[in-house]
Each structure stands twice: as structure tokens, then as C-alpha cells.
């Protein structure tokens, strides 16, 4: 699908990637999931996904066009400060969805899919990408994490999303 506006500039840095991996793995450790490994090919894919998502307002593009076999978490933030938001901000918002996850009824995940993908035990590799720049009103940041193996598979939540 063609975008509504040009993509925002890439803002993926080594520091951003280090923070993304550290933040993700800190939360995964709480849930007895093995640490993720940063995969260079997935980093490039996440960067391209962040750019393409930024061609649309906020998160309107959703997960359209996501390649098969890949999980994805999407974050959008905007504000008056002219600097990209940190990976930790995205991870904190995704992890906060734990409030909606019922470990006693693990198949009901309508409002907590970012959390469950983040801590999904079966995911072993990740990539992260960030774009940021001036939007129509505010300075905008899009952050994408991609995962392989993808999470959120029906019938597999209890084994892959463990209590802290």
C-alpha cells in the first residue's frame, strides 16, 4: 500500500539497539524466557518496517505487509521535544499490558499482545528500528521490534508466557 506522506528519517543508532535489547531481555528474564539475540538481518527489516509505518498517521498502517514467520511490536509517540523517544519508553508501554493478561486464562489476549510477544519464550532473535522527525503537528517517533519465532500463537500461551 502506498503511503500518505514521506517516511520519517532513520533514527536507529547503536545506543538505541543496545537499549532495546537490554530492556527486552530484562523483562523476559522476569518471566523465565531466554534472552533474545540481536540479529542484523532483523534489525534491517525492523528499520524498513519503521520507515514504512511512518508513512501513515500514528499506528494506522498496523501490521499490514508483515512477512510470515515474524512477530512485531509497534510503538508510536509524539511530543513537542525535538528528539527521538527511547527504546525503553516503547518497551515500558508494551510491558504495561501485563495488567490485562490473565495467567489463569492465557488464551484471552485481546489487549495485551505486545506484552505477550515481548516475553514469548519461543522467540529467540529480534531486530529493532526507529524513525523520528517532524510530523504535521508534533515531533513523531515510530519504534518497531520484530521477533522470530513469532509469538501470540493460540494454544501456546501457557507454555510461552510464564508468570514473573
Positions of predicted regions on the chain:
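Disulfide-stabilized extracellular recognition modules
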Residues: 83-164
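Extracellular cell-wall/glycan-interacting regions and their flexible linkers
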Residues: 1-7
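Generic short alpha-helical segment signal, independent of protein family or function
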Residues: 51-54, 79, 95, 99
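Non-transmembrane alpha-helical segments in soluble domains
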Residues: 25, 47-50, 75, 91-95, ...
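Conserved, non-catalytic sequence blocks in retroelement Pol enzymes and Pol-derived host proteins
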Residues: 11, 78-81, 135
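Short clusters of hydrophobic/aromatic residues that line enzyme substrate/ligand-binding pockets
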Residues: 36, 74, 118
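Peptidoglycan-targeting cell-wall enzymes and recognition modules
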Residues: 67-93
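Short, well-ordered surface patches within globular domains
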Residues: 8-71
